[in-house]
């Protein structure tokens, strides 16, 4: 616990006054007695209830057997201050018990909140409690707080649009969602390791989905820090690889992947969003639960085959792009956080690496079968060429090995 900066003790009396956002929130000041004043002064630095109890017991020389009652009194006083908004719990101290653990794209998440608070969309990504406890240390602690925040956190606004406002403040980031009516605010630590979502209990299916959607920017921020980036795209499995199809809103990426399903019986992977990372020398696509309205997702990880950028046209045409054009177009389809120059550079460098090492196609096309046939033909040709090149490389390696071995024997 520590004091909310919008409350200040002024002058020599025992009155505490509000200012700034607290005035706007119509929060009143308060008068403190001697004991409350001493606790207030202690809370000028972050304190636990246990630490406050020990310090007050030492100051008033309270016997050990009476310190249990003292702890209850201090806990009650702190709860009053929390309700009043005069103190706040620092990020990193979840309230309640762990309601479940999730494992998404290698990121381990512990969720705290009311019973049954975890959205059903995460069911396929739940972890069991077994295994090595050391390996179960969470990468993200997510607190789902079914209440209003004690006060609204102001800060420097980084982005603001119809759907999301992101501001930076002393402990990290604040998210606000104008279109998600039962989500009040999200407070997230600067390193993405802890987030607290203030929300109202959902009263319909739309509001239940809102909580699931509100968690997405928290996850994508942490994923970005781990070298994984999200591309707005539909994906399918072909030649044992994930192929991503992306284009402007309304382009018909789902329609295009449906053509593949109809013509070539290719399995879908995700209908709207794909998370790409790199493991060793390979780019991979991770299964994630967010998939737009398609309800198409997977928990599996697949090697990335390539990216197909789609554009409406009266006929089918594969257009050649420069490396710079590929990088720019891939980055434009990414939805990993671009809130700061540093984050934007991360997106750019990753898009550049993908464009350099994996095929990026630009297909101007119709919604006819010929669109899928055109790009499939090109993919097959390139995959055969790549495989032939790899086979030749292996043959050359095998030829060199005996020669090198012979030279060693002679020496």
Explain the meaning of each model-derived region.
Residues 42-51:
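Short capping segments at the starts of secondary-structure elements
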Residues 30-35:
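Short helix-coil-helix linker/hinge
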Residues 7-21, 25, 36-37, 55, ...:
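A noncatalytic interaction/capping subdomain that flanks phosphate/NTP-handling catalytic cores
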Residues 1-6:
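Eukaryotic partner-binding/assembly regions in large regulatory complexes
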Residues 28, 41:
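Generic anion/oxyanion-binding catalytic loop in active/binding sites
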Residues 256:
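Hydrophobic positions on the alpha1 helix immediately C-terminal to the Walker A/P-loop
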Residues 253:
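Conserved lysine of the Walker
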């Amino acid at each position: 616990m520590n004091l909310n900066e919008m409350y200040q003790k002024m002058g020599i009396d025992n009155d505490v006054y509000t200012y700034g956002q607290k005035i706007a929130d119509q929060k009143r000041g308060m008068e403190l007695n001697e004991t409350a004043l001493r606790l207030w002064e202690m809370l000028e630095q972050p304190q636990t209830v246990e630490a406050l109890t020990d310090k007050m017991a030492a100051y008033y020389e309270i016997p050990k057997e009476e310190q249990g009652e003292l702890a209850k009194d201090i806990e009650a006083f702190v709860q009053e201050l929390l309700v009043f908004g005069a103190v706040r719990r620092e990020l990193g101290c979840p309230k309640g018990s762990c309601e479940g653990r999730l494992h998404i794209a290698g990121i381990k998440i512990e969720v705290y909140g009311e019973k049954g608070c975890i959205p059903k969309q995460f069911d396929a990504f739940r972890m069991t409690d077994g295994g090595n406890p050391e390996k179960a240390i969470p990468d993200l602690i997510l607190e789902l707080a079914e209440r209003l925040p004690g006060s609204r956190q102001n800060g420097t606004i980084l982005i603001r649009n119809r759907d999301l406002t992101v501001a930076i403040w002393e402990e990290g980031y604040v998210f606000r969602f104008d279109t998600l009516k039962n989500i009040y605010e999200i407070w997230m630590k600067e390193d993405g390791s802890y987030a607290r979502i203030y929300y109202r209990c959902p009263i319909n299916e739309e509001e239940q989905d809102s909580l699931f959607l509100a968690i997405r920017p928290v996850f994508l921020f942490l994923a970005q820090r781990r070298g994984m980036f999200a591309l707005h795209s539909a994906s399918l499995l072909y030649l044992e690889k994930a192929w991503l199809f992306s284009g402007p809103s309304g382009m018909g990426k789902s329609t295009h992947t449906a053509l593949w399903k109809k013509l070539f019986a290719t399995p879908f992977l995700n209908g709207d969003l794909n998370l790409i990372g790199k493991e060793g020398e390979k780019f991979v696509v991770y299964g994630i639960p967010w998939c737009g309205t398609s309800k198409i997702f997977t928990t599996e990880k697949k090697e990335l085959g390539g990216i197909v950028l789609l554009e409406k046209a009266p006929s089918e045409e594969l257009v050649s792009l420069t490396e710079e054009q590929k990088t720019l177009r891939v980055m434009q389809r990414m939805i990993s956080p671009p809130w700061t120059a540093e984050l934007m550079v991360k997106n750019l460098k990753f898009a550049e690496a993908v464009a350099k090492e994996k095929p990026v196609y630009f297909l101007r096309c119709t919604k006819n079968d010929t669109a899928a046939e055109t790009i499939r033909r090109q993919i097959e040709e390139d995959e055969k060429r790549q495989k032939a090149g790899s086979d030749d490389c292996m043959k050359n390696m095998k030829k060199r090995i005996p020669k090198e071995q012979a030279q060693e024997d002679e020496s």
